[in-house]
Regions:
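N-terminal small-residue-enriched
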Residues: 1-485
Length: 485
């Protein structure tokens, strides 16, 4: 693989090219799904290709190919330069890159069981056993289970001398149970909605999340929701369990801190950002107990945003995004860091394949834990609603006004959970919501959730992001009904 990168890089005219990098990516994926006791899908995919990014006359050019013959490698390198030249004819200003040190390294994400050492039959058997447990519950109409595994090896070479060989292994799985009664459709998902839990781990993740052992309980909750009362409307204290809070972080913090959105370089997919440059270090984003970091280091955990180096060869870092409630940092690239006067990128550039140019993407955007136990948090809540597991979301194109629907709620009165609620929702304004946070559970309740399907860019790119959170309480939040059924 390294030969292909070296060959492409050698075809560039170093006198003309201000900077260039080459990524050779080899990937392997397996996806298996089941539906009501039958196999839904079993797909495997392998890919090998190369992308060249060149900075010429102050503008980027990018080209890619999966034809790795010498002639094709030369052609793709020249095409990247030609695209940069053409782009320079319409440039407003020259692109400047923040400095970065040369890196030579090899890194493989740790795992205990190579997921690809397991057979399709073994994978299918696990999903079908979980499916059977869920369908054994009277009143369950539909059960869907899924398992995903991916291994990506990337060779990165740059004209600055960096040479990085990086391999990441990701595994994910989940189950969704549905109950239909008349016009009322209720759903419970585990460990999370939208495909479950994904982490930078091997097949050992399946032992940890215990799909088979939990499937029946989740199905029983889906059926029980039909008898639950609708979520009351009004202003209440809201406790969000950690997976829902993870999505809240993703949408109302993660996307608006992407510096390309702030600078107007990205708008088509998910909009721009309310976090204009004047707000950096001047905005009270949340209450004093709200501390949010962007942390791609393995020390933070095996998240989907964990790596050793980003796709510009910048080492993984931890960056304070919100410190004691104050907005303190963006997600940046070498280009955008230089544009706002920062000395260095904080290493967030990633592409979802060899045929896509790197973009600023969330790493692990996490709310740091507090000091509460969940039992104590509930006991100290006189009138509130505990909401679990995302079902829907909506947020405006500047990431400021939002509404989320959840699968299940619990009404809390005088410190006790008194009744199940169905179709709960809550809405608010980003900074008002985070400033209303008055309690966060401790490390024992903290989970690093994986979001495997974050979209950005045109052509569209799908990226996995991580979000660490523990249950937290927010005061005086508008709550109501997400679905009328």
């Amino acid at each position: 693989m390294k030969y292909y990168a070296e060959k492409a890089l050698s075809c560039l005219d170093r006198h003309e090219v201000q900077y260039a990098d080459v990524r050779v990516i080899e990937s392997r994926e397996r996806d298996i799904t089941t539906k009501n006791g039958k196999m839904g899908n079993a797909a495997s995919e392998e890919s090998l290709g190369l992308g060249v990014r060149a900075l010429v006359n102050g503008c980027w050019g990018f080209a890619s190919t999966d034809n790795l013959s010498p002639d094709s490698l030369a052609a793709v390198a020249h095409r990247a330069v030609e695209i940069a030249r053409a782009s320079a004819q319409a440039k407003k200003a020259d692109i400047v890159l923040a400095s970065e040190t040369k890196i030579i390294d090899t890194w493989v994400s740790p795992f205990k069981i190579d997921p690809f050492s397991t057979s399709v039959e073994q994978n299918l058997d696990l999903l079908l056993r979980a499916d059977a447990e869920a369908r054994s519950v009277k009143g369950i109409t539909l059960v869907e289970a899924s398992l995903h595994m991916r291994r990506v090896r990337q060779i990165f070479l740059s004209t600055e001398g960096s040479a990085i060989d990086q391999t990441r292994v990701v595994t994910g799985a989940g189950i969704e149970t549905y109950s239909f009664q008349n016009s009322d459709i209720q759903k419970r998902s585990y460990p999370n909605s939208f495909r479950g839990q994904y982490q930078l781990k091997g097949y050992e993740l399946l032992d940890e999340i215990r799909l088979v052992e939990t499937a029946r309980h989740i199905a029983e909750e889906a059926v029980a929701l039909h008898q639950a009362e609708q979520c009351p409307q009004g202003k209440r204290s809201v406790i969000l369990e950690s997976s829902q809070l993870g999505l809240q972080i993703h949408e109302s913090i993660g996307h608006p801190i992407e510096l390309d959105r702030v600078l107007g370089m990205e708008a088509n997919y998910a909009g721009t950002s309310f976090l204009t440059l004047d707000k950096l270090r001047n905005l009270r984003y949340g209450s004093e107990i709200v501390n949010v970091v962007a942390d791609a280091r393995l020390a933070h955990g095996p998240g989907l945003g964990t790596f050793a180096y980003d796709d510009e060869g910048v080492p993984a870092q931890r960056t304070d995004i919100i410190k004691d409630g104050q907005f303190t940092g963006y997600l940046s690239s070498r280009e955008t860091a230089a544009a706002i006067g920062e000395n260095r990128s904080n290493g967030t550039m990633r592409a979802d394949g060899w045929n896509r140019i790197p973009l600023i993407r969330m790493t692990n955007i996490s709310l740091l834990p507090g000091t509460w136990s969940l039992d104590d948090l509930i006991a100290s809540t006189d009138d509130g609603i505990l909401m679990e597991t995302n079902r829907s979301w909506s947020i405006d194109d500047r990431r400021y006004h939002f509404q989320f629907g959840c699968e299940l709620g619990w009404e809390i009165k005088n410190g006790k959970k008194v009744r199940m609620l169905k179709n709960p929702s809550y809405s608010g304004i980003t900074t008002e919501f985070w400033n209303s946070c008055d309690a966060i559970c401790d490390q024992n309740h903290w989970t690093l959730w994986g979001t495997p399907n974050c979209g950005k860019g045109q052509p569209s790119q799908t990226m996995g992001t991580g979000h660490g959170a523990a249950p937290a309480r927010f005061r005086n939040v508008t709550v109501g009904i997400a679905y009328a059924g």
